[in-house]
Amino acid sequence: MRHKVGQRKLHRSTSHRLAMLNNMVTSLLEHQAIRTTLPKAKEARKIAERIITLGKRGGLANVRLAARTVKDRDVLQKVFGEYKDRYASRPGGYTRIVRLGFRRGDAAEMALLELVDRPEKAAPVDTEAAAPAEETKAE
């Protein structure tokens, strides 16, 4: 029986799902906002909230626990430095999900997952667009 199982499988194997969510959380903590589908955003939010809470607690053991999810050392330093100070007085609820409507290709519901109290200049990263960035030619 599947009583009280509170996790979405997202139509992926366990290793694929965990790797995808870890990468999404790392991108969220690095760029402070990501654009993705609503179910993925809801799952990534759970992990991101836990990582920020570990950052607020500090300590070597919590750094090692967070490093299991966030592999980027610069992002870890940001969590245990900048975010620790930013969210010191907030008892939880560090992220916000804003619904963006439906994607044109497959009608999947899109959402913006962002950190609250973030600077307005930070633009969201589109996790769905795999198109290469256009480079300007130096003339």
Curated annotation (Swiss-Prot):
GO terms for molecular function: structural constituent of ribosome. One of its GO terms (biological process) is translation. This is Large ribosomal subunit protein bL17. Keywords: Ribonucleoprotein, Ribosomal protein. The gene is rplQ. Pfam families: Ribosomal_L17 (PF01196). It comes from Myxococcus xanthus (strain DK1622). It comes from the Bacteria. Coiled coil: none annotated. Belongs to the bacterial ribosomal protein bL17 family. InterPro entries: Ribosomal_bL17, Ribosomal_bL17_CS, Ribosomal_bL17_sf. Part of the 50S ribosomal subunit. Contacts protein L32. HAMAP family: Ribosomal_bL17. GO terms for cellular component: cytosolic large ribosomal subunit. The keyword Ribonucleoprotein applies. SUPFAM superfamilies: Prokaryotic ribosomal protein L17.
